[in-house]
Amino acid sequence: MVHSQLPVAAPLRLLCALLLLPSATMIPGGLYPRSVTDPDVQEAAECAVQEYNALSANAYYYKQLRIVEAQSQVVTGAKYYLTMELMKTKCAKTTGKPKVYKEIQNCELPPKAQQEKLTCHFQVWSRPWLQKIELTKMSCN
């Protein structure tokens, strides 16, 4: 009786072991971790900071301190899910042409006692063939 179970048990154990291995294949529409230094992630972060400052009612610009986490999802294009830390700068938003990302990143920070840091969650949708990248969702605290 024991011998009759062996042919079934061995393949079943092998199948279970294979299912426990990390999968190298991508699941369509799934979220995947991305390196925070990846150029596509950096481009999405620039868009997020630029749009945050354009939409924010704050009188001062906020600059990127760091990207805490980055994930992407294949959609019609790519959607990036970013967790970022932003810091309020000394650069005031004045009338005229708004500052671009690189200018904002060069803004000085206030003294430690006056610093305001935000943790933000951004979703950025990139469609390179249309030369379009846009912020679709944000929340900061």
UniProtKB/Swiss-Prot annotation:
Q: GO: which molecular function terms?
A: cysteine-type endopeptidase inhibitor activity
Q: What tissues harbor this protein? A: Expressed by the venom gland at an extremely low level (at protein level).
Give the keywords, sorted.
Disulfide bond, Protease inhibitor, Secreted, Signal, Thiol protease inhibitor
> Among its keywords, does the record have Signal?
yes
Q: Name one GO cellular component term.
A: extracellular exosome
Q: Which domain of life is it from?
A: Eukaryota
Q: Motif Secondary area of contact in this chain: where?
A: 73-77
Instruction: Return the annotated site residues (Reactive site).
Output: G29
The region annotated as signal peptide is 1-26
Q: Specify the Cystatin domain's residue ranges.
A: 29-129
Query: Does the keyword Signal belong to this entry?
Result: yes
Q: Which Pfam families match?
A: Cystatin
InterPro entries named in the record: Cystatin_dom (IPR000010), Cystatin_sf (IPR046350)
* Purpose of the protein: Inhibits various C1 cysteine proteases including cathepsin L, papain and cathepsin B. This protein has no toxic activity and its function in the venom is unknown. It may play a role as a housekeeping or regulatory protein.
Entry similarity comment: Belongs to the cystatin family.
What protein does this entry describe?
Cystatin
- Native species: Tropidechis carinatus (Australian rough-scaled snake)
